[in-house]
């Protein structure tokens, strides 16, 4: 290879590697906007992006703007397949700048479950906001439901995963 081509290649790689940390730092430092509507979810604990005190609060519009997924599955509570839609749990944690390896998911009634963040990454778990195209009311597992893709991964049909499938979610604490 000619020396000037090699120097250009090495120089380009060096500039790219120097720019990446600054872009990452800018992304991590990006402010989280304050919610305009009623707060559906509060994330606290080991997070770096906040919008109210030391918490990240999300309204419906903010949650709908995050990367999302549709899961068609039955659940231990819904024997027939349903279409669930909502933001990826991992995307919610990323938006809050979560640093931890575990989360405590808390429901409106005080029920809580510890969930390893690796579950969110491995199974593309969502915080379901809609079932069959309709927002989920509190009386029907809403407003948010930690949903695993049960039908796609039969190994998820266990007592441990059922316990992690919290519904009526309103808070997540990151550890």
Regions found by a protein language model. Name each.
Residues 1-4:
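Positively charged n-region of N-terminal signal peptides that target proteins for export
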Residues 24-175:
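N-terminal intrinsically disordered, low-complexity segments enriched in P/E/S/T
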Residues 8-19:
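Bacterial N-terminal signal peptides
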